[in-house]
Swiss-Prot record:
EC class: transferase
Regions of compositional bias (Basic and acidic residues) in chain numbering: 345-355
Entries under Pfam families matching the protein: Pkinase
Catalytic activity, reaction form: L-seryl-[protein] + ATP = O-phospho-L-seryl-[protein] + ADP + H(+); L-threonyl-[protein] + ATP = O-phospho-L-threonyl-[protein] + ADP + H(+)
Family: Belongs to the protein kinase superfamily. Ser/Thr protein kinase family.
E.C. number: 2.7.11.1
Protein name: Protein kinase ORF74
Species in which this protein is naturally found: Ictalurid herpesvirus 1 (strain Auburn) (IcHV-1)
């Protein structure tokens, strides 16, 4: 028996890549090849050479003198595991076709593992504490013994039904650009843990490994690279379009989830399903996706639109071999992409030293990365990186772009349409004498989940869509609130209610107050010309909504002497969190006419993040001049009580804040004092 097996997801690449240099032979890599890379360099080179010859025949502008390297180039086979073709060879125990389940008991991982092989084969002992795994997956590790791959499964705290649903979904999805499912195994660990093993076809490598190959950056193969990138984009879009059309969200699209397959003298790119979900919009994975869309970052939700965000960033990494955004900074997308939106905020961020820091901008980031990316892709990337999910294109919309219409000149006609998904296979599994039947089914679904469609402010509404939330202390017997609409109870925050001063981080000063039977955490931004920017605003939203189980409310705007003050607050259990940001923007612009005072209900947060600061100031001035105080039932608001003192920066500050608690956490209060 030869070959190796891939369990559940692509084999993981080593943590560090060889160093890069610019020698006379062109930009390439030096150093030791990654030992555990599931990569066949000779097969890659064969595809490269064959594809390049086909490109040369069609691209007449390549000088004849530049084609001699084809005969002089000698491929070097990298050490490590070499796979040929796309076949999968594995233990007979796991050869389940077309779709069956096998219950097998395994030992705890900290002890020696005995893999019982079917049909009388001897037991192979693997010591997980000393033997080095040749590959590691999310739920399984693979060990090599006598040139044979053996699987050690990791117990999971999952129900049999969840395992069955995952395998059922994978088995019923079939497309030329999805990694093909070969079989599944459901197991029970001796201590009661549930595990699942999903067998899929094995390609040459994943995309992250592919772009680390010397061939990818060699100047000789520039024309192959240009064509391959275009085909990579089309193949992955085709796979995502099929998933989205059938109500499946990938959830963690990245380079490790794109598998490279050789097809004659060409490459085919297939999407590995990973931990896809059958829901239109689903709770985020237990581990954060590599490319987190804004709605995932701030609401913990994953939808099709998040897949398109991740697709654009993954393709950019394939083009440039580097990430577009810096990791670990949730405000990055807003600093870079904020100016791309309609009527973007034209205010300046202020650093710790008070110097203005302008938003970076999309084009500036491209220049900083020093990359020459195909202009055709940059246009699509910009569309997919819209901050608001409802503005991003779908995979189907991108596939009709002219960029992908000319691929047939080299690669032939497009892939045949996938077969129609049939009825669910009659499969069941019995665990502890309790039978479970999967009720999962592939179903068509709209292009966008209604919980994110046509929303001005996706953060507040997406969280609200998850479920109704009622702050418990508002409705507790003998508590602060009154269930009758319109009744509000005021809480005043002052120096007397201050319990502790937490400190200042990222220009946010944090204080904890105790008033009215509730703990109130107040975040304040203070500084010379503390103008709000999109990055500052969204950072406070991040602070206020760092956990999906917390309900965010964006509450109250009021006008001080020369400052406009924005508050962001959220409530969880018996704790009220509020954030204050100061704006020292004079109100000089006249407001447009047309507001009906009797029915006025203004979402200033939505106006601010979609129409810009100048337009928002017009609205605020109109509200102030008309003395309008529109507060629906259940409103939560913050207003300044004593905006009289001045701080050392010369701007107005407030010694006390009044918090008005009402009945509806999602309703805004607008008006003036």
């Amino acid at each position: 028996m030869s070959g190796k097996v891939e369990i559940n997801e692509p084999l993981i690449v080593a943590t560090s890549a060889p160093l890069r240099c610019n020698c006379t032979g062109g930009s390439h890599f030096h150093g030791k090849t990654i030992a555990n890379r599931a990569l066949g360099s000779s097969q890659l080179m064969k595809c490269y050479s064959g594809l390049l010859k086909r490109c040369v025949r069609r691209e007449k502008y390549i000088p004849v003198s530049d084609r001699g390297f084809l005969d002089a180039y000698t491929p070097q086979t990298a050490p490590g595991i070499v796979f040929t073709g796309s076949s999968l060879v594995t233990d007979s125990t796991l050869m389940m076709a077309p779709f069956n389940f096998h219950r097998q008991h395994v030992l705890p991982l900290e002890e020696n593992f005995g893999l019982e092989r079917a049909r009388g084969d001897v037991t192979v002992d693997i010591r997980t504490d000393t033997d080095e795994a040749v590959a590691r997956g999310l739920r399984s590790d693979m060990y090599e013994r006598d040139a044979v791959g053996h699987i050690v499964s990791k117990p999971q705290k999952r129900t049999t039904g969840e395992m069955l649903d995952e395998l059922m979904m994978t088995a019923r999805l079939s497309h030329g650009n999805l990694v093909r499912f070969l079989g599944g195994v459901a197991c029970e660990e001796t201590r009661g843990g549930k595990i699942t093993v999903k067998m899929v076809e094995l390609g040459l490598c994943n995309l992250d490994e592919f772009i680390a190959e010397p061939h990818w950056i060699a100047p000789k193969f520039a024309i192959v690279r240009q064509y391959t990138l275009c085909k990579l984009e089309r193949d992955t879009l085709s796979g995502l379009e099929y998933l989205h059309m059938h109500g499946v969200v990938h959830g963690d699209f990245r380079g490790a989830k794109v598998i490279v397959f050789p097809t004659a003298d060409d490459f085919t790119f297939k999407v590995n399903l990973g931990e896809s979900t059958s829901l239109g919009i689903a709770p985020a994975l237990s581990r954060a996706p590599y490319h987190r869309a804004p709605e995932t970052e701030f609401t913990g939700l994953i939808g099709r639109e998040a897949d398109m965000w991740a697709w654009a960033l993954t393709m950019y990494r394939a083009h440039t071999c580097k990430d577009f955004f810096k990791k670990g900074d949730p405000s990055e997308p807003y600093r870079v992409l904020g100016p791309m939106d309609n009527d973007a905020l034209d205010s300046r961020r202020t650093g710790r030293d008070g110097d203005p820091v302008n938003p970076e901008g999309f084009g500036t980031r491209l220049e900083k990365n020093a990359t020459a990316v195909d202009g055709g892709f940059i246009g699509l990337m910009g569309k997919c990186l819209a901050l608001y999910p409802q503005f991003r294109p779908t995979a189907r919309e991108l596939l009709v772009y002219p960029r992908y219409a000319t691929l047939h000149r080299i690669s032939g006609p497009g892939p045949a349409p996938p077969p129609v998904i049939g009825a669910a296979p009659a499969v069941r599994v019995v665990s502890n004498a309790v039978e479970f039947r999967s009720r999962w089914g592939v179903r068509p679904s709209p292009a966008m989940d209604p919980r994110l469609e046509a929303r001005t402010s996706w953060g507040k509404n997406a969280v609200r869509a998850v479920g109704d939330f009622t702050p418990s202390f508002l409705y507790r017997e003998g508590g602060l609130g009154d269930t009758r609409p319109g009744n509000k109870r005021a809480i005043t925050l002052s120096r007397g209610t201050l319990r502790s001063y937490v400190g200042t981080e990222n220009r946010l000063t944090t204080e904890i107050h105790r008033s009215g039977g509730a703990d109130i955490v107040l975040h304040k931004v203070v500084g010379r010309r503390p103008d709000i920017s999109r990055a500052n605003l969204e950072y406070v939203m991040k602070v206020s909504n760092g956990f999906p189980e917390w309900y965010i409310t964006i509450d109250h705007y009021t006008v001080g002497v020369t400052n406009v003050h924005l508050y962001v607050g959220y409530i969880t259990d018996d704790i009220v969190y509020a954030s204050a940001i100061g704006l020292s923007c004079p109100l000089r612009v006249d407001i447009l006419k047309g507001f009906e005072k009797s029915t006025l209900r203004v979402d200033l947060m939505g106006i601010l993040v979609t129409r810009g600061l100048a337009y928002t100031l017009r609205v605020i001035r109109h509200l102030k001049s008309a003395s309008i105080y529109e507060a629906g039932p259940h409103a939560v608001g913050l207003v300044f009580v004593n905006p009289s003192s001045r701080n050392r920066f010369g701007t107005v500050s407030c010694d006390s804040v009044k918090l008005e608690l009402g009945d509806e956490p999602s309703q805004l209060i607008t008006g003036s004092r």
